[in-house]
Each structure stands twice: as C-alpha cells, then as structure tokens.
C-alpha cells in the first residue's frame, strides 16, 4: 500500500506546447508498472485550454470546480460544471478548458498504452475556442 499525502507531489505548469493560457497540473495517480492508470487534477485559469489531442485508451474528466468547455472534433462546444463527468472514447480528437470568464478544475483519468497516455496535436485557435 502507498499513501500519497496532500502536498507531497509537486504541481507543474502546463507546457505552452500543450496548453494555451495558465494551467496547473497536480499529479494524483502515478501507479507504477504494470498498472496503466494515471490521473491529475488540472486547473485552467479563465481562457486557458488544452491543444487538440487524443488518448489511445480514452479519457474521463470529472469537473470539481468552476465552469469549462469541452469539444470533440466536428461537435459543438459544450459547457461543463462541477459534478459533470465527461468520457472521450479512444482516439477521439478533442480539447477542454475553462470558459473565457471562469476558471475550471477537473480530474483527468486515462490509461497508458505502450507507455503513452496522450497524443498532442495543434493548438485550439481563438476562433475555434469562441465558436460557442
């Protein structure tokens, strides 16, 4: 058994190649091999968002604070709130982040396939982001 105490893992700034705006990533689940699951609490300041990306085994988001937007490629931008759970199937191109005026925090859970949890793509443009 392993217990990770609150504050025992360092926060990381979301890298500019994967995010637009200010994003903080707080690791939650970093199970060692052979476990596949990983997870983090991710906080997006207003206007911040991910780049387009996919997950080889899908991704679950659990919104814990604020208001956010999510979109799958070709679909509408949808608003999400605390308590909402979002599932992106394997290899579904999507993005997620805060609304322009409200920060948003979610827990992101995904599994590793061949050691990889995500495939990052191009940035979400301001036009795509504000298409709501």
Residue ranges and their predicted role:
Residues 1-37, 117-132:
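A short, N-terminal "cap"/entry segment at the start of jelly-roll beta-barrel domains
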Residues 24-27, 38-55, 90:
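Conserved short histidine dyad/triad with adjacent acidic residue
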Residues 60, 87, 101-121:
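A short hydrophobic beta-strand segment most commonly corresponding to one strand
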Residues 74-91:
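Short acidic-glycine-tyrosine-enriched beta hairpin
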Residues 50-52, 70-71, 88, 93-100:
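Short beta-strand His + acidic residue motifs that chelate non-heme Fe in jelly-roll/DSBH
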Residues 41-45, 54-70, 109-111:
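Short, conserved beta-strand element in jelly-roll/cupin
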């Amino acid at each position: 058994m392993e217990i990770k105490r609150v504050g025992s893992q360092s926060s990381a700034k979301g890298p500019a190649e994967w995010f637009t705006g200010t994003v903080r990533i707080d690791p939650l689940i970093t199970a060692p091999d052979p476990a596949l699951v990983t997870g983090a609490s991710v906080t997006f300041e207003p206007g911040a968002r991910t780049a387009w990306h996919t997950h080889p085994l899908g991704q679950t988001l659990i919104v814990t604070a604020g208001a956010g937007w999510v979109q799958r490629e070709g679909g509408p931008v949808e608003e999400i709130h605390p308590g909402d759970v979002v599932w992106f199937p394997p290899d579904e191109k999507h993005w997620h982040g805060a609304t322009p005026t409200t920060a948003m925090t979610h827990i992101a859970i995904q599994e590793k396939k061949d050691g990889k949890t995500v495939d990052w793509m191009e940035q979400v443009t301001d036009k795509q982001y504000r298409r709501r």
